[in-house]
Amino acid sequence: MKYQQLENLECGWKWKYLIKKWKDGEAITRHIDTSEADAAIAELRRIEHEPTLVLAWIEKHMSEELENKLKQAIRAKRKRHFNAEQVHTKKKSIDLDYRVWEKLSNRANELGCTLSDAIEYLLSEASRSEKASQKVTSIKEDLSKLLSS
């Protein structure tokens, strides 16, 4: 699915991505000399709010190993950004204990589906089971009334 590219917004994402990688200790520049790398990073930090300069910095200084990773990160961010606009495509998050996640993950693998699909399946099965149980209870009560009269 294609999503509209918003240059100013995406330049901000690229800047944040590069700064995060740098803070995590990764080499984000193509420069071998540390003084050149430090100067390039200082320049990057100065141009946070200059989208066209961020793009020029990427062309001039960014490590080639990061090129695909940056493209993938921006593509994913773009998808999340546009999906968040509509309720039915917006992702929700839940906290699970590890053992619960592990059981759910195993069940999803058995079913050959995603975790979301597995949760949906298990909920519908539980609902079906509950309705069947109520029906059996109702039949037992009716049978009991018939036998006692």
From Swiss-Prot:
Alphabetized Pfam families for the sequence: MatP, MatP_C
A GO biological process held by the record: regulation of DNA-templated transcription
Keyword line: Cell cycle, Cell division, Cytoplasm, DNA-binding
Location of this chain's protein in the cell: Cytoplasm
KW Cytoplasm (keyword) present: yes
Cellular component annotations (GO), alphabetically ordered: cytoplasm
Gene Ontology MF terms: sequence-specific DNA binding
Subunit structure: Homodimer.
Known role: Required for spatial organization of the terminus region of the chromosome (Ter macrodomain) during the cell cycle. Prevents early segregation of duplicated Ter macrodomains during cell division. Binds specifically to matS, which is a 13 bp signature motif repeated within the Ter macrodomain.
Protein family according to the UniProt entry: Belongs to the MatP family.
Protein name: Macrodomain Ter protein
Organism field: Vibrio parahaemolyticus serotype O3:K6 (strain RIMD 2210633)
